[in-house]
Regions:
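N-terminal secretory targeting modules
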Residues: 1-173
Length: 173
């Protein structure tokens, strides 16, 4: 089975400011359910992505001072994430100036997610109001193969032309 693009399985807030604080508590505030790349319905197959940036707008419920993102893959081979960013959403594909944050995974800005696994980003400082929208941008430097997707998504996602557009304030595609 070819690799499938992972999903943003959750964002959260921390009640404590110290990463080593045993009282720190993360709360999931957004997630989605994915479908197979091809449901057998003409026109609904997703061939995947190749050297592109994906920007997904997520409407969160709980706000906070710090956020982190979980990414997963359902594929039989690893999924390479070349870079990932999170920012406050402006309009369309635009992000609010000054809100862009680089996501890292164990201190590294890129990661290969093993088949069937999920990864959690390191926390980043970002003051997020409750009931706001965030833009999560993921650059995939190679061909992902068929990508999982959500059949009844209620937010517009953006796909760039070839290249790294993850921190652009303007439209990502």
């Amino acid at each position: 089975m070819p690799p499938l693009l992972g999903d943003m399985a959750g964002l959260g807030k921390a009640s404590g400011a110290n990463e080593n604080n045993p009282n720190e508590h993360w709360v999931g505030t957004w997630s989605n359910a994915l479908h197979q790349p091809d449901l057998g319905v003409p026109g609904l197959a997703n061939p995947g992505f190749n050297n592109q940036t994906l920007r997904q707008i997520v409407h969160i419920s709980v706000g906070g001072r710090r956020v982190r993102v979980r990414l997963s893959t359902f594929g039989a081979s690893g999924l390479v994430i070349g870079a990932a960013h999170i920012a406050l959403h402006a309009t369309g594909a635009a992000i609010l100036t000054g809100s862009d944050r680089t996501l890292t995974f164990g201190g590294t800005p890129s990661i290969t997610i093993p088949p069937g696994a999920l990864v959690v980003s390191d926390p980043v400082e970002l003051n997020v109001p409750e009931l706001s929208d965030l833009a999560v941008s993921i650059f995939v430097p190679g061909n992902t193969g068929p990508a999982a997707w959500h059949f009844e998504g209620r937010q517009t996602s953006f796909i760039s032309p070839s290249g790294r557009f993850y921190s652009k304030r303007r439209d990502a595609g």
